[in-house]
């Protein structure tokens, strides 16, 4: 927060950091639990930074000291595949409903704990649109058109009900006339270099 303010930023909107069992389900604040070697550590941070623009990313890693378990690799692969699939799918002129209908389909074991939206707008804050899953469309969805020069944050969370851990990932993407540009460059690897 201090660095953001010193550089002309305004406020922190989200600051979730959790490890091990506190990563599942998502949205748990950090605690006094000491991070252990081999724990997943996940964070989600949004801030209104210099010039009044929002930055919103999430990452999850395995803490050094132990190799990732097969479960951790599976969770990470699911979350990463979902993000990649949905980013590859989006294009200008696509409706919100088309994205919802064609978006990555999580297996049933992940649906109860999934993140609330496939993607949401980013500009001066986390904002319109909030693109819901096809299963939630009748209750929460609304249609619109994804336009060129729109920034969307694509979200994913993979954590099983009753599972030990979960992985949260998020990328900001500029939708252009000719495609898209991922705006954040921080590694999405399970074990960052």
Give the location of each predicted region.
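Active-site neighborhoods and metal-handling regions in enzymes and metal-associated proteins
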Residues: 1-193
